[in-house]
Amino acid sequence: MRGDGPPIRVGHRGAALLAPENTLRSFEAALAAGAEAIEFDVLDLQDGSLVLAHSDDLLEVSHGAAAGTVRDRTLPELRAIVPDLPTLDDALAFLAARPEVLVHVDLKLSTRLDEVADALARHGVEERTVVSSFHLESLAAVARLAPRARIGFTYPEDRHGVARHRVLHPAIRVGTRGLRATLPMRVVGMAARAGAQALMLHHAVVSAAAVERAHAAGIAVWAWTVDLPDELERMHRAGVDAVITNDPRILDSAPAEALATLRP
């Protein structure tokens, strides 16, 4: 959860800028680009299947192939549209065969959490997994059901799909500046309420003061979704423990002076 040098490279939905997101092909692209951890989203379908999908928007999940909703379809119906759609078991089998890779499961469901926990245990990846959500009840359930997994609290809740945009809208930038100013006073209580060992923070709300307070309380800080050099440089200066990015190669261009300032 905490890095001993440069921040942990976390591939966002695999490597969403290099291959279709939340697919095994995207996982492979992320690892080829130097990712040390893979983040992916888990969503539940009406037939009980757990699949890798960021939202209920079929246009997003099908990579633009079809419109509609996701959750009210069965796995065979979805795979007729998105042949490479992985299930949770598919993803964990891939990662179980790569024991050096950290696993980051981002919950897009609040039910069937026992099945998520069971899958982590069956594939032997629980101890190297962090499970994240903004939903406190879901995190509490996972902590009980998968006690060897780490818990990450996501902040702020991404109601407007901010993570999809490489450049923030001016109104959103103003809002995040306000959150960034107050966050240092809130990080410890926020993590405590969530029972979290890590805070998954949007890069726009991260500050050195927030990271310092989190670290003083033994809490890791992972920043999402960092795709631009200036964002990366600011995360280096703030001292975050992990960078979640759509293209892990961005860390190859990190300035040496920024790397040298990272705290252990």
Tell where the protein language model's regions lie, with residue ranges.
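C-terminal active-site rim and adjoining tail of enzyme catalytic domains
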Residues: 85, 154, 162-264
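Metal-dependent phosphodiesterase/phospholipase catalytic core, i.e.
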Residues: 3-7, 46-49, 54-159, 172-175, ...
